[in-house]
Amino acid sequence: MIDVLFLGTGGGMPTPRRSLSSLLLNFKGCKILVDCGEGTQLSMKNAKTGFKDIDIICITHCHGDHIIGFPGILSTIGNSGRTNPLTIIGPKDITRIVKGLTVITPYLPYELNIIENPMQKLSFNVTKENLKLESGGELLIDTLELNHSIPCIAYNFTVKRKPKFNREKAVNYNIPRKFWGDLQVGKNINYEGRVYTPSMVLGKERKGIKISFVTDTTPIDSIISFIEESDMFICEGTYGTDDDIDKAIKNKHMTFSQAATLAFRGNVKELILTHFGVTMERPEEFLGFARKIFKNSYVAEDRMIKSLKFD
């Protein structure tokens, strides 16, 4: 299971109802923060999430409404007692930006591991301490370059699901019971001249959980295959109606209907709209424009929580 907490759902500048762009994923007690706009810490405090267990911060791009809360978050994480390394993932130039922002937080009690503009999937395993970058992990993060006014990337977060234990296969291979547990968790066993592998005791692959996060971009075609069959597609809806399509094109953002079209073409399960323009006081009033195209469309609210479970 993975919990999705919307910390900030506004774009451009905060409003009385909405902090700026931020999202928190909780997987087995380890947390991933996606963007940290103004108000992120306050939302986390109100939601009582804690700060120490944030293992990864993913930045979509370096406009202020997505990153201005970054130095404060780093400082608070340090004050919470964290000493394990913290991974930062971001677009081209994120290393330079992080170095600039951390001038005001120079004495952090933990190491920053920066991954700039990753070109391949990143694999993480849950350990006793944190999410650790290593091959064969149960959590995958991959990115897609978007079309915005500065380098910007989308994210997929995929939780792999382990195949079921197949007792019949284990018996047919005459595998000693004492090795069944180790084989289930992926270990190979050498015993009395034979090699036992996990495939000898496991069934078919099972569908995991996929969450896609796309914001601050025009609706480019590459997004469709990137979000394909996502369980949750979180997408910007800076403008409510297509009356503002010229503004959307000029500023490289999207309308509700454009986001819904991507959701429909990507065959996702549900669309959650976020990153609402400052003039859109009640985004729910425009939800019909999205639902005409994609029925399972919803509007995010600050501190709204969604939980996704395996089918």
Swiss-Prot record:
It comes from the Bacteria. InterPro entries: Metallo-B-lactamas, RibonucZ/Hydroxyglut_hydro, RNase_Z/BN. Zn(2+) 2 binds at residues 65-66, 216, 275. The keyword tRNA processing applies. The keyword DNA repair does not apply. Its EC number is 3.1.26.11. GO terms for molecular function: 3'-tRNA processing endoribonuclease activity; zinc ion binding. Zinc phosphodiesterase, which displays some tRNA 3'-processing endonuclease activity. Probably involved in tRNA maturation, by removing a 3'-trailer from precursor tRNA. This is Ribonuclease Z. It comes from Clostridium novyi (strain NT).
